[in-house]
């Protein structure tokens, strides 16, 4: 069990009872090994401790014999050494492995132990106590010894015969690092150096001690070989303090070596027999112990030749080791004679008895090691041992032993238990060899260690079985009940014990997930269960047969119950909390697996919860008691339900028998009986009421199908097959009998079965419970059987039909067995056999079949699911039933009615109805369409009724019906007829319930609803004295045309399998007859939305279509009728359509004959009637039911706060913030979002620049310097509001200011803005300087005091006046220019306060409250736009603070781009009351540049985004945006980069990442809406961009497939790149194609592609267009040479021929940018072609490109070799004046059909393409 660094529990799954190497493997749920990740190495290494000679007690190594592991898992799940918890460290544990293990070794961290087995190495996690890694041995010899590297915790060394293996347990695929043969004889021991992880010492029977340097494991270097010259060596150990000293044991000699010398330092005989073990002291450098076959352990202090002390034992010693902690402790195991582990104290002089004996192993102990936990104040140690009894045991040291050996520790106190005093009583325990016991949890003392496991300390105890403390030496474990007084309270331990026993044969634990702490149990009990059956389970509780019993429970059931019987299943999921058993588990029923009703499940759950609560109050385990109680409750439920079912069946049978002759008149009795049974239609199941105590009843036995064991196919014996065939023959024969005989047989069978007193021996009755045989491929399913299969079929099995719920059963190919004879319609539905036909019963593609349970839920017939972008998908599956037409007698009666008069038609019609009632039992189920809700048989009305919404209970119902009879038997317009029809339908629908189970649905789909037929034919007496044409609705041509448009797939809406896909109106599925719901208005509220959905689905189905013979149009439902319940079936057959047409014609003709009483039309009526009868006969097979599938996609965007119209119209940049807020506010008002109107007005006010100004120049200074003047109505912000709010809101009307506006006005007043006094006067004339001269003349004439006498004087006077006016005009213009200049200067000198307004209560706090509000509403659209606008406002303020010039947006002529100079800032002079003022500055002209466009970003190769002031961040999203006159792309000037100061922004800088998240989510929403430009605009506001990551190319070794960082594989010692031509590894310059990955030596590849274009490997890749070969410098030299050749050719052509004058001028204009063509007649035209062609951009060629290959924009290398053949062709093409050669790479480009130029155009192209490095360059060159 493991805890991670956060103390989270990581629990393993349960292990099997016995772990074997061939069958046991770690479940897949535990394959979360850190060794499979790159961080595994860090986990391992972090657990290790650095060795130090000053701290030798931290080292614990192992030695011993070999062994084999058992687990096939390749992953390791292990714990952190720093978190060795108390789950396994403070207790004794026992783990069973059914393998032979010779040696074990514990890693330094104390978390893993390696078992050296016969064929593999097995790594066991000591916290999980299970195998987590199994490494197969690479040798035919078994593993001799293993040792764990103390420096590198991932390295393990093992020996096999003469070879040494080095393993890396972190590597899941290739764990073997190296293998080398180190000796001539078998290796007896090996030891890693404690100071250098690369040094390994091995010893062998060849008497040599070899020391290896493993820096390169495959080429291990033996740098030292020590020769003993004596017999073979047994063990070797390194000194714990000196890295140069090691000791080895040779027979009876001990040798100590110094590797710096060639000879040994000590060579002496230490024992009289063979030395088997040596170990260096952890405290003294010179101290070493030896153990021998002479039954002694000697302690030496070399170089003294005498032992320091000697321990004498009674048995030969196999191994002896010092305790890693404390002082003086020595642990020994015996070679033979005893099976105990003894602990000795070397500090005392009494060595006669050990201080502790660990008893538990039942066979010789072969190896042991220490598990150490060492810290500053808490140290602990545990002994890990392995014995021949195949048990791995963990032994803890008691506290008194720790005190004895001076081990510092913290006493362990179990939680939830009182602290007890530690005793020193020595207690030993032993266990018998129990084959069923896999892991035993033992204790060695009498204290509270055993019983202290609780929910807090042992959340992850492994799969253990407990042995109870006892002072006795013998302890047998038999069937253990979970005794709460002496059992550890651990979930895993409890589950293990429960799995090892059989609580009940009907109970099974299906799934255990200890990581999630869940357990799924299933209880399956047959319905014929008897209490006597429990006696058969008494012999199943023997622990010696646990493994076989649990696996053979189903097999026992097969032997005991060979008949296929119905059963009751309950499946529960137990979820155990972390504090279990202090808190009780959570119980959850799995609905689809439970066959019990909901009421029973709730009762079971409440009972189990009470039991769990009682146990948890006492902190006791409750799981086992819950399982026992669960089985009892299910059994009690079956026993309680059995008498109820029996009595119901008997009652139903009697009622049916009594009412057989009067079934038509007493339909209510049958309906009441149907309500008492779940199966209210034909094909119901009969409950099993067999008594096992009776031997008189013979039942045809069927093979029991194991529902849970679906791994194999169950074969049926020949005898059983014969019985099944006889059963099928009997069933088919009996089904064709009369109804009376069937009833008598049913009653007799039920009576004999239930009473069973007369000893009557009965065979299988045709109406007995249906018995299902095993499905076999290739065999046709018999009648009356519904097979449900539960496993995938084999590949060679035949294809089976679809599921019954998806199969359209309206056109059954065979008649129902109960339809003939007329009596089956009167039978009760619960005891009649199913009439499901052979062809329509579908078998799913599974293998093992089992019976459909009674309580399987019905599939969902309707529902709705939300889709993306504000869509709701609503679907409905409607069951439509074919209601039978009238038979021939009714047709004849109708014919007689047609010949009679109107007065006699009533009597005839009544008699016709009576005849229908009389012959209803013999009528066939054919003809018209109706639903399960009911319908009129006499009129064959198309009545559609949804199963789950019965809307037929209205008191008044207008029912439009279509007359299908020969008479005018349509619905009358009178209220009486309508109410009678409505009442009949209501009576019928009350007896029909929606299907609640899957079986009921199958019965509805497969059988004919005879009950509806009888009800309607017995009660509907419709008057037909009125005219038929008056009852029918007039045809609607518009509706008809629209219907035809919606069905383009067929001219007629009636198809055999119609399917409509109306993408325009989002309707899919089977077509309905009307689509009036398509144009329905969208909902505007959730309440209207619910009504809208119901209207949509009802309108799509509740429609009527009739065929008018005169107009040839479809008659649709009346527009004025709101309650219309009739509808058409989407599955008319052709015969049904003809029948409708004929009956319609017949009805019309009958109506005319009835009115006119003409005899000439009677013959036509008779002919029509005959045709009608024939059509009815042809349509005998048209009965059945079908599913009308309708799906509607509804737009519910109006219900969501996200608005696509606002998203498409919002402005987020390109204008001043005030204008943006005003514009967005108007958009929100149009969308009726009043909250957004207030929001945008508020944002416009709080982002006003005046709120940030620290102070302004007072009004007197402004007047004295600039002489401002203006009219009282002139304002700078477009309004005359005293608070300046009207300008921001864009309204000049007088209104009461809001609270926010009042607060803002107060804030502005407090910011030293002041008000303009009313005494301010104008310093210049208000006469406009732009008045024309004639206006000035007339004005001056009025100012003349008197006119002179002469005309000449008047002219001079006027001229002087005009001159004065001109001078005044010039002065005024000069003053205006000065005013504008001073205003600009004043703006630049204005000081903006950084931390003033944002920290105000109406600043960031208000913004935060707005964001929190819309965050609760989850309106990501508003959140994103708010964050964008506030950043834009901060950017504008930043420009004002920096004094930058503000430019306009868009073109200079735009109306919205007026500069600041064109909008003079003026003050209002006041006047009137109050002294109003206008804002000092007009900030409406402040604007910024729009985001960067795509073209400019490509040219600059990088774009800058909005970011904090003073920072630049490169764009990761290359999206531009252009939008009319609002937005403009970036220029190349650096000032175009938009920056802002976070101190000026109203957004909290600490939440910038959250705001980026809002923008990112909103951008994703815009992407789904298709608003890509808007998305790009929002993405530019994102501040935290992802760092651009380049393309990383990985190279894999051609031999081991490892991914390499360079071109050399250290594992294989080869170069990874292999040449595709010479097949030799490439060491130098290489070139390869990035599309196919093939390449090689550059020279080889270049030589290949001089003549070839395809890849040399034959992969088909055109590498010649993807593979560079030479450097760019060489390629540029080639281009220069070609350019010089072209210039020489042009000069030669100029001397030979004179050029036209206009050509010479054009030549000078194009010099330096283009080249001339070699062909003289086309030089001028070609030059023009070059001027346009030279700027063409080319994309790199890829193998997926089917066009001509083109040159990429960037090539690092190219080919310098030319093809001579291509060169000649090129010269011929250019008439001998070509470029002199064609590059093999560019040949197709130069001579492509779309290019008529030579390489001169190509030079210009390549010159432009090499100006920058394109990021999408797919070429790579390596050296």
From Swiss-Prot:
Native source organism of the sequence: Dictyostelium discoideum
Record-given protein name = WD repeat-containing protein DDB_G0292056
User: Per UniProt, what is one GO molecular function of this protein?
Assistant: signaling adaptor activity
Checking SUPFAM superfamilies in the record gives: WD40 repeat-like
Known InterPro entries for this protein? Answer: WD40/YVTN_repeat-like_dom_sf, WD40_repeat_CS, WD40_repeat_dom_sf, WD40_rpt, WDR59-like, WDR59_mRING-H2-C3H3C2, WDR59_RTC1-like_RING_Znf
State which residue ranges cross the membrane: none
Bias (Low complexity):
16-61, 419-432, 440-461, 654-680, 717-748, 885-926, 966-993, 1014-1041, 1127-1183, 1282-1293
Q: Where are the WD repeats?
A: 138-177, 182-222, 228-267, 270-310, 312-354, 360-405, 1207-1250
Record field: compositional bias (Polar residues): 749-768, 827-840, 1710-1725
Query: Which domain of life, per UniProt?
Result: Eukaryota
Q: Repeat: present as a keyword of the record?
A: yes
Enumerate the UniProt keywords alphabetically: Repeat, WD repeat
Q: Does the keyword Transmembrane apply?
A: no
